[in-house]
Design a protein with these regions (language model features):
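Membrane-interface aromatic/basic loop that binds lipid-linked glycans or pyrophosphate carriers
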Residues: 12-13, 17, 279-360
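Flexible acidic/His/Gly-enriched loops in nucleotide-sugar-dependent glycosyltransferase catalytic domains
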Residues: 113-181
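Glycine-rich, basic loop-to-helix element that forms the pyrophosphate-binding segment
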Residues: 82-98
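Short, well-formed alpha-helical segments that are part of the catalytic scaffolds
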Residues: 30-43
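Short aromatic/hydrophobic "clamp" motif used to bind/position activated sugar donors
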Residues: 103
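Conserved nucleotide-sugar donor-binding catalytic segment
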Residues: 151-229
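A conserved acidic beta->alpha catalytic loop
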Residues: 56-65, 107
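Short beta-strand/loop segment that forms part of the nucleotide-sugar
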Residues: 49-58, 78-83
Length: 360
């Protein structure tokens, strides 16, 4: 999907500047919550270090009145897409139009915590040779009660609370958002990040200071996956598989690192198995059979790529019981508690019966 962009709205304080940070904000019909986000950027008290790149994804209402309030406080660059593409392609346009040395992504209805950029910059200056990624914890917060509902110290499949070196990491290694995914775009991007770090043995900085409040709202597109849970996951199960499978295929072709490839594919098979068990447990009557087909395609690729039989794939789970139960617990976070209709072994063999040679 190709999305054309034009410069639509632009504030710039003073002459052309070189920025340390780019804050990329995908926007669609934002309201006063965008103002709260921008207030949290102003409160960092380092405006000369920061550019705010707003990528508007075909909003149907004008919100220039919100941006006007910040024309003397922030360096804001606004671009407008020609085609509504969702958060993935919109964030990709943000990378392409950013100029900061480091880039971070934030949703239009979330906020940064105080002194984030100063604290993270100190970490970067302590390790000047590490120009890849700064990973930080963040909070999930109920927007109605303003109570923290979850603390995520190391959410590696999320882009939130992370700061990426634009030139020496994202651009150098072609880490990008997929143009064709409407959902799970952050998993696709994060899989590329993990693969590049792992396959090139690159270090990154782990910062222990929380940087970000991720708010849950009933009307937020970016949070509907959490809101609708099981139904969302079942509807977009194919895109979930593709969001990991496609970057793993790219990385396998480029790096030939079978240890990384095997770990990702075998883990993805387990997640797929548990998700399907959840679908069957909660909605067996209207279960989408296409999701079995998608799982079979993943199983076919895993066997072809790694040269493994069904029995060898199943044996991996027996050899890694901690991974098995950790993945089951994480999967239950999306589907809810479940009773497995089939064991992993019987499910694998039913999806793709193992052909056995009989000696005559």
């Amino acid at each position: 999907m190709v999305i054309e962009i034009k410069i639509y709205y632009h504030f710039l304080l003073g002459e052309t500047m070189s920025y340390f940070w780019t804050v990329c904000v995908p926007c669609y019909n934002p309201d006063e919550r965008l103002e709260k986000l921008l207030d949290s950027v102003v409160a960092q008290n380092c405006k000369d270090d920061i550019e705010v790149v707003i990528i508007d994804d075909c909003s149907t209402k004008d919100y220039s009145n919100i941006l006007d309030k910040f024309k003397d406080k922030l360096n804001i660059f606004k671009y407008e897409t020609k085609l509504n593409g969702g958060p993935g392609p919109t964030r990709q346009r943000g990378i392409e139009h950013s100029t900061g040395e480091w880039i971070t992504f934030i949703d239009q209805d979330d906020v940064f915590l105080p002194d984030v950029f100063k604290d993270v910059k100190k970490q970067i200056e302590e390790y000047p040779t590490i120009q890849t990624l700064v990973n930080t914890p963040f909070y999930i917060v109920d927007a109605v009660t303003n109570q923290i509902t979850q603390y995520l110290p190391n959410a590696d499949n999320w882009i939130h609370g992370k700061f990426y070196h634009r030139e020496n990491f994202l651009l150098k290694y072609n880490i990008h958002f997929c143009e064709d995914l409407y959902s799970h775009e952050d998993i696709y991007f994060s899989t590329l990040v993990k693969g590049v770090l792992n396959c090139n043995k690159l270090p990154y900085i782990q910062c222990n200071t929380p940087t970000y409040n991720w708010y849950t709202y009933a009307d937020s597109l970016s949070h509907k996956e959490t809101e609708t849970g099981l139904n969302y996951l079942e509807e977009y199960f194919g895109e979930y598989i593709d969001s990991i499978l496609e970057p793993v295929m790219q990385l396998d072709e480029q790096y030939k690192n079978k240890d990384f490839t095997a770990k990702q594919l075998l883990t993805l098979l387990l997640f797929g198995y548990f998700y399907i068990q959840g679908f069957l447990y909660y909605n067996s009557t209207n279960f989408k059979r296409d999701n079995i087909t998608k799982f079979r395609q993943l199983l076919d690729y895993t066997e072809d790529c790694l040269g493994l039989t069904n029995d060898e794939i199943i044996q991996w789970t027996y050899n890694n019981p901690k991974d098995y139960f950790d993945i089951r617990e994480k999967a239950a976070g999306g589907t809810g508690p479940m009773i497995e209709t089939y064991s992993y072994a019987s499910f694998i063999n039913e999806v793709k019966p193992q052909v056995k040679n009989n000696d005559s």
